[in-house]
Amino acid sequence: MADLHIDDFYRDVATIFLRLYAVFPRKTILYVEDICGPDQPDEFGLHHPRFQAGFSAMVWLAEEGYLNFQDTIRAEALDQVVLSQKAFLLLSSRSKLGLTEQADEDTVPPSVAEQSRTNINQLRHVLREGSSIRLQKYVAFMLAQDPIGGG
């Protein structure tokens, strides 16, 4: 039996990292619906389990030291959220896994080739590919890395 909730978790983590990296170092509001789509509450007004899982992924990343935030907005968003030093250094560092094609240093400037090897660019590429197996492998790899710089 496939663990679809784990596939969703890895996709949520990737999306959270990409959204927060795009605005770093500014603090922002991160809405669950921007991560996993709109909520579909039940007849009692309770959040859909998928929506709850998206919120839980955001909180888990904070508990594990990848995000800092000031407050929650109900169970729908994190307020004043920003990548932690640990997450920023992980995402901006050179990937040790190299799941994706590297830019050819003969055809592009060295700075562009080096940038293509960062974890954030590798993550963008893997997410665009749409393979949940490759995404799971890459996010799991990143989460297993020791913090850079004591972060």
Which residues are covered by each model-predicted region?
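Short, amphipathic alpha-helical interaction segments positioned at domain boundaries
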Residues: 79-115
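Short, cationic, amphipathic peptide segments
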Residues: 104-151
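Non-catalytic, well-ordered alpha-helical scaffold segments
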Residues: 10-14, 55, 64, 81, ...
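Short amphipathic alpha-helical interface segments
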Residues: 2-45, 52
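Short, Lys/Arg-rich nucleic-acid/phosphate-binding segment
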Residues: 72-80
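Short amphipathic alpha-helical interaction segments
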Residues: 45-64, 78
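Generic structural signal for hydrophobic core residues of well-folded globular domains
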Residues: 20-24, 61, 90-94
